[in-house]
């Protein structure tokens, strides 16, 4: 008695996978890093930890898990960051520029966003308003899923001119890409707000606290 064999070829073979692995740029973007040397240092350190990250199909990326923890023991330094409406020095200040740059690129790559939080202010380093992504310890994370059929790889680095580059490589099977943009509908000028302080004598001319930055508001679409 003989049993006929029915051979079924897999849709995705090893040879096909290797031939198509990371062959396409799914999204890419660069931003310029300003500020003191500690900020550049933190961004460079985070970019090195992010660089080379590979996500298999269906896997979810966590920015905090990849570049954290945001501590001195982990290698980060104190630099400017936003806290409660103020610009103050805190450990790992500057890393939100990398998370924002990465978010911008994932939108271009048409990847599925799982978690993203906006800043209180427009930081000014993103070319498109609304493409920022703030992160902090275990409270705020930036996460996205590889919703493609192939693995994807992240390349990130800070060049000698303090320009931050992020590129996502994968296999483009759909030809669908995003190009984020914004349109400023209206501008709301900032207003000075004076707060009483017991240590300042009554009648003294008010001074602006240097720890507070003034920003115009934008309504964008």
Show where each model-derived region lies.
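Well-ordered beta-sheet/strand-loop patches within structured domains
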Residues: 1-221
């Amino acid at each position: 008695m003989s049993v006929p064999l029915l051979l079924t070829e897999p849709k995705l073979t090893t040879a096909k996978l290797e031939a198509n692995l990371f062959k396409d740029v799914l999204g890419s973007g660069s931003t310029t890093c300003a500020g003191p040397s500690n900020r550049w240092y933190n961004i460079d350190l985070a970019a090195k930890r992010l660089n080379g990250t590979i996500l298999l199909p269906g896997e979810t990326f966590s920015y905090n898990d990849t570049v954290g923890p945001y501590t001195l023991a982990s290698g980060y330094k104190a630099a400017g960051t936003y806290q409660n409406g103020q610009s103050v020095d805190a450990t790992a200040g500057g890393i939100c520029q990398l998370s924002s740059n990465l978010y911008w690129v994932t939108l271009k790559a048409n990847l599925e966003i799982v978690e993203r939080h906006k800043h209180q202010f427009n930081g000014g380093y993103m070319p498109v308003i609304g493409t920022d992504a703030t992160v902090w310890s275990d409270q705020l994370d930036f996460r996205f899923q590889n919703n493609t059929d192939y693995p994807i790889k992240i390349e990130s680095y800070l060049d000698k001119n303090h320009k931050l580059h992020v590129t996502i490589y994968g296999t483009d099977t759909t030809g669908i890409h995003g190009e984020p943009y914004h349109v400023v509908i209206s501008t709301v000028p900032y207003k000075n707000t004076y707060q009483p302080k017991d240590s300042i004598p009554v009648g003294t001319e008010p001074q602006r606290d240097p720890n507070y930055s003034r920003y115009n508001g934008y309504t964008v679409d």
